[in-house]
Amino acid sequence: MPKRSNGSLVVRCAVSVVRFSKENVSCDLASENFTFSRDSFPVVSTVLRVSEAVYRMAAVASLGSALSVSSAALSQNVSVSNNATKESAFLGLRMGEVAKFGGALLSVSTVAANLKSKPGVLSVNAVTAPAETMNKPSSKKTATKSTCIITGASSGLGLATAKALADTGEWHVIMACRDFLKAERAARSVGIPKDSYTVIHCDLASFDSVRAFVDNFRRTERQLDVLVCNAAVYFPTDKEPKFSAEGFELSVGTNHMGHFLLARLLMEDLQKAKDSLKRMIIVGSITGNSNTVAGNVPPKANLGHLRGLAGGLNGVNSSSMIDGGEFDGAKAYKDSKVCNMFTMQEFHRRYHAETGITFSSLYPGCIAETGLFRNHVTLFRTLFPPFQKYITKGYVSEEEAGKRMAQVVSDPKLSKSGVYWSWNKDSGSFENELSEEASNPEKAKRLWELSERLSGLV
């Protein structure tokens, strides 16, 4: 949050130090001048606030160059010169571009910061990322690509899907990720062409971050065709709950609540897409579907009467579990996946006929070596992959799972709405049946209404 010192407002900024005086603030970045009026302070402060995930990317000095600060300027404002040879990017916006925020102009071009030792500077953080990932369409070929947002696209199924779509040459993927630099490195490591992806920061455990992501995506001026809600967290061995920024148990707060808000906000964008393309896909899990063997492994998913969710899921005024019971990390994840499948069904019931958007969920197979299991015990991580490969025969590689999800994104044969897609070794994709717990329309409606209230949509 902004801090006041000597009558000035100093904002912790991801690119430099910005000092707000009583009258205004002026900066000089890359020989471009901009001034914010006092009336713009709340807007600019909001724009420049950076989430904890972005702060972790601070001070990437290995890219070379630094910012210098005029000590004389520090008494009233900050003058910064850029010696960089490359443009940087921040939160999905190219730094050299000018964006309008509530009447104030903000233009930033910088690569790294080395200001902490400068006198008078109270708070500094620097963020850098390759500019080429932020380019707006520069050719007819790029401009005509369809656009797909994938949450959690920096690893696992999300990254594999991004790769599969980019390889067609027909898709531009928006990688919505908590760790900006991890996503950038991941995209490069698998060879996704630089004109086929954009990384935009999104932490689903924070509603502020979700809303900022939507704003930043819209500033790219791309038409959204498909939203894939893929990201998930899983804490099977935790004895005590973790919580999101809004105070929800973290598995449900991230996997369900964050995605629910994101999907609702982006409905406006999806409705503008071409009818043959517009889809919303929410990744399910066999563990949340109790009519399967895996879904019957204790603890089983069970939302009960949603008593915990109705109370806020915060572990203080209510239980941290949706059903109001004692905390169980594995069950919290399974419950969140039931919520995902409920959300898909309710979107279909409420919006498909009116908008033509295809809403679906899927289970692409058991990705036994996914990073989702990184918090599991070592013995499980060692034995689970061979068990799935040689005993259940349900194992699927991340690459193959990514191709399957890419099918659900773009294959005309998988355009049926309200469907939970699954695969098996012999027959390929098929419409799977959901358990009674995961297909209760009254419970789905109640979940929707509670989620609307808790996310501030009503």
Swiss-Prot record:
Keywords: Chlorophyll biosynthesis, Chloroplast, NADP, Oxidoreductase, Photosynthesis, Plastid, Transit peptide. InterPro entries: NAD(P)-bd_dom_sf (IPR036291), Prochl_reduct (IPR005979), SDR_fam (IPR002347). One of its GO terms (molecular function) is protochlorophyllide reductase activity. Pfam families: adh_short. CDD domains: LPOR_like_SDR_c_like. Pathway: Porphyrin-containing compound metabolism; chlorophyll biosynthesis. It comes from the Eukaryota. It catalyses: chlorophyllide a + NADP(+) = protochlorophyllide a + NADPH + H(+). Its main location: plastid. Phototransformation of protochlorophyllide (Pchlide) to chlorophyllide (Chlide). This is Protochlorophyllide reductase, chloroplastic.
